[in-house]
Amino acid sequence: MDIRPIKGNTWVLEGMEWIPFYKLDERRCILLDTGLLGEREELEQALLDHGLTPAGILCSHAHVDHGGNNRYFQEKYQIPVALTAKEAGMCAGLLNLKCYFLMLPPGMVEREAAHLVHTPDVIVPDRDGPLSFCGAEFQILQTPGHSAGHIAIQTPDRVCYVGDALLSREQLWAKLPYCLSHQAGIESREKLRDVDADFFVMAHRGMCRREELSALIDDNQALAQRRAGEVLAL
């Protein structure tokens, strides 16, 4: 798993998705998501190869490709995990997870997703604004839609990690956009237009500069509306 600098102390790990992290110093970092369960060894080794250990996890949302290793790092390194209350509730137990994996029987949920069950140490407030976490000051933007408690996270370097609120340009034609709430997703994407950041990082492998953001939002909105129209026409 390669790592790539974005700006200042903000970097990304390049796995199946991009996992941003913020370096507190030369040895400690805050992970913004933890990727898939199957990426655990590669993710951990990439950090170790660069002399880094996680000091905390600030999670955009609790889907399998974003919070898949939260509990592992929380328990192994004795570090805090921060989630919104809505996402924390989903991870509170197997029955709660069944609401996410609605079509799967309970036994399959346990086999496929038991690793997602954990209790966060910090509940991210249900509002936009600053969040002090593990000695760093982040800006939180509530961006529900893709999931109930999805957030975008801006690092002190003016890098905004939008998680799954936006698809990168390379994914616009390769991925079916999913939203728990289509309308909330539309509103959250529009909200991103006003974010005062220099770079925007998308979980599904992409980044854009401030001046490129508006066009990318337009294309995301058009894709969502087009797919919704196709479904409606069935």
Language-model segment annotations:
Residues 224-234:
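Short amphipathic alpha-helical interface segments
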Residues 37, 130, 137-144, 148-222:
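Metallo-beta-lactamase
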